[in-house]
Amino acid sequence: MTDLVPLLQEFYRDKLTMMRRHAAAARVVAQYDANNTYQYIINREETQLSWIAKAIEELGGTVADGADGGRSLSGKGDGASRAAIEEDARDAQSFVDRWRPRVDAMTHARHAKMLRVILGEALEAKRFFEQALAGRTDLLGRRADVLEPASGEVLPTRWIE
């Protein structure tokens, strides 16, 4: 168990960094369906981080929230959006490639399964990114035939009076 807490803490930091990078990307990805997909992915990542944090705390460890996304996105429009999505697709695969061997070597079945679920969801996010790059708008499901195709853009920040 002595190796388990540091491993979970490192995984947590990597996942937190990934979530913060996705939040930064969501500010430049304006296409409605792609942005909704980012919101869905970020929500899942918040849930995953809560699972990992709970596991760390149950083992007597502490959770550090100091990870920085380290992402500065410049530009606007489709070019900036495409660059962010392409980078996130690559990062998702890199995350899985980096962590899968370590997770597969874990002997603690419950925590290994939890991390495998998270790795699977990272691959699902990668698939969403690839579909967005291909121009798909049915990322989170299909609309009824009676409705028009989605259109519109999302503002980079919330407008509150």
Over which residues does each language-model region extend?
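Iron-associated oxidoreductase/ferritin-like identity signal
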Residues: 1-161
